[in-house]
Amino acid sequence: MITEGAQAPRLLLPPLLLLLTLPATGSDPVLCFTRYEESSGKCKGLLGGGVSVKDCCLNTASAYQERSGGLCQPCRSPRWSLWSTWAPCSVTCSEGSQLRYRRCVGWNGQCSEKVALGTLEWQLQACEDQQCCPEMGGWSGWGPWEPCSVTCSKGTRTRRRACNHPAPKCGGHCPGQAQESEACDTQQSCPTHGAWAAWGPWTPCSGSCHSGTHEPKETRSRKCSAPEPSQKPPGKPCPGLAYEQRRCTGLPPCPVAGSWGPWGPVSPCPVTCGLGQTMEQRTCDHPVPQHGGPFCAGDATRTHICNTAVPCPVDGEWDSWGEWSTCVRRNMKSISCQEIPGQQSRWRTCKGRKFDGHRCAGQQQDIRHCYSIQHCPLKGSWSEWSTWGLCIPPCGPNPTRARQRLCTPLLPKYPPTVSMVEGQGEKNVTFWGRPLPRCEELQGQKLVVEEKRPCLHVPACKDPEEEKL
């Protein structure tokens, strides 16, 4: 179906499906969660473990895992997850390829015919992080040695070279160092004056809390070794003292460790259907920690799974709209290829409502006005090149990508609105049908011109869940 003002569709081959991973459907115990996060594909709100998939999925908003850190499966009817982000390009320069995937997730069914739960669908596209690859440069010859770094005793001298024979390109560099140094001797002795090394750490106080009998003290020391003064020629000694002492101030009273009181009563189950959590609490007050004593070890609360054994209501969900019916006008055999407006309709089904859940909101039937151009010969014009499509097959040998130019029909200049029933105002009219466009021959073709290219540096398709094991 072509509507007025719409762009010509791109021709894409279907992506390849592979790697089946079937979720738990039996009675083996699983980890049960309150919800499934669509954006990340992760389970959220742990209820607990040791329950069957059937009990966990009494509430279709819940989700489960067969093991900690494993694949999260929602309890709702199966559907495709969101596409993952594109993986990094397979090469860092020039043209490469990159992959992304989505998975069939849910419980007790299939995403579509022959597409089981856990199935991965892959997409592959070309990518280019950097147009050119780095080219290494070459060094010039070494320059002359610079003067010695000191005027007495021994020092170092340096010489340099430039990375310009040739210069690197596209982010490249020259291997090795741009300068080198060597020792040099002035044959002149220098006096070395003494300097203190850093203070050592304070020794522990003689007491850690108030005792009422003495004032604890702490001491630290340092050495005249950074450097030591020279003997010939003589250097100056370090000024000041090598030791210092101070009183320990602000010491606290001796600490008292805290201890837990008894567990309180178990709270009621907070839900009326599916699984919930009950809670017990205790207080760190037997005794309360004092004067910096440690708090009670362990948790102040603990939870237990409670099972109502009652299924939760499941709201109905609209299925996809069906195809538009043929554009017709009452009491007329055919209105195709004529400036005569008609009507067409499409339907949808409310599916999945259970246990007194809400019915689907909105209308089951959609009606619109239309002009029929089914099988009408129309003058056409060639479209611009479409964007490059995905690489097909994404996980098979020798994937290719394609783009097309299409013979697009020029729609008749019929009125865009009509008044079908007096008093109901103007209604928009849509062109419907598959016309027969006619374009001048292009590259030996009359309807579609296609160009194909191979996809380069293709990475392997690997299940991200298997890489975690």
From Swiss-Prot:
Residues annotated as signal peptide: 1-27
SMART domains: TSP1
Main location: secreted
Region entry Disordered, spans: 218-238
S-S bridge residues: 32-56, 43-72, 57-75, 89-127, 93-133, 104-111, 132-170, 148-184, 152-190, 163-174, 205-248, 209-254, 224-238, 269-306, 273-312, 284-296, 327-370, 337-376, 350-360, 391-455, 395-461, 407-439
GO cellular component: cytoplasmic side of Golgi membrane; extracellular space; secretory granule
TSP type-1 domain ranges (all copies): 28-76, 77-134, 136-191, 193-255, 257-313, 315-377, 379-462
A Pfam family hit: TSP_1
SUPFAM superfamilies linked: TSP-1 type 1 repeat
Glycosylation sites noted in the Swiss-Prot or TrEMBL record: 83, 86, 139, 142, 145, 151, 196, 199, 202, 208, 260, 263, 272, 321, 324, 382, 385, 388, 428
Ranges for region Interaction with Complement C3 beta chain: 351-359
Keywords: Complement alternate pathway, Disulfide bond, Glycoprotein, Immunity, Innate immunity, Repeat, Secreted, Signal
Origin: domain of life: Eukaryota
Complex formation: In plasma, properdin exists as dimers, trimers or tetramers in the relative proportions of 26:54:20. Interacts with the pro-C3-convertase enzyme complex (C3b-Bb) comprised of Complement C3 beta chain (C3b) and the Complement factor B Bb fragment (Bb), where it binds (via its TSP type-1 5 domain) with C3b and Bb. This interaction stabilizes the complex and allows it to become the active C3-convertase enzyme complex (C3b-Bb-FP). Interacts with C3b. Interacts with CFB.
Function comment: A positive regulator of the alternate pathway of complement. It binds to and stabilizes the C3- and C5-convertase enzyme complexes. Inhibits CFI-CFH mediated degradation of Inhibits CFI-CFH mediated degradation of Complement C3 beta chain (C3b).
Name under which the protein is recorded: Properdin
Species lineage: Eukaryota, Metazoa, Chordata, Craniata, Vertebrata
Gene: CFP
